[in-house]
């Protein structure tokens, strides 16, 4: 099963995206024999939406990072082979998601990690 992170033109990690990712990982474990995690067309992800984070309470920020941690653990503990497909940069939490994959494959060229 392929899971593609798509969140606008900057592909930022948001609470909604992370909750959808968590659900998709759980669904993949029940319906497929492998998992491919992909980012956007130009880059994997710009990481956490800092503008959002600056406008939130510490409780909301903590909840979002707990959700990110949940996704990371799901990827690490997934019984399926998990592959991270990297095109372009992967910043912050996005890099953590890729590091939780069993295998990572990147496109040729220079990238920012």
Stretches found by the model and what they are:
Residues 72-113:
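Glycine-rich beta-to-alpha active-site loop
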Residues 1-38, 73, 77:
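Conserved CoA-thioester-binding segment of acyl-CoA-metabolizing enzymes
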Residues 37, 49, 97-99:
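Hydrophobic/aromatic residues within transmembrane alpha-helices
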Residues 12, 45, 93:
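Residues that form or flank phosphate/diphosphate-binding pockets in enzymes
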Residues 11, 42, 111:
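Glycine-centered loop/turn positions within well-structured domains
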Residues 35-39, 82-85:
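Short beta-strand segments at enzyme active-site cores
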Residues 19-20, 31, 39-71, 90:
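Glycine- (often His-adjacent) and acidic-residue-rich active-site loop
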């Amino acid at each position: 099963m392929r899971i593609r992170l798509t969140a606008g033109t900057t592909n930022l990690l948001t609470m909604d995206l992370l909750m959808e990712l968590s659900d998709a990982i759980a669904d993949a474990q029940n319906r497929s024999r492998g998992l491919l995690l992909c980012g956007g067309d130009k880059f994997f992800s710009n990481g956490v939406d800092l503008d959002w984070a600056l406008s939130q309470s510490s409780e909301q920020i903590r909840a979002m990072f707990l959700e990110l941690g949940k996704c990371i653990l799901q990827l690490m503990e997934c019984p399926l082979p998990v592959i991270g497909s990297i095109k372009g940069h992967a910043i912050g939490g996005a890099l953590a998601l890729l590091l939780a994959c069993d295998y990572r494959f990147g496109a040729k060229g220079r990238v920012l990690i």
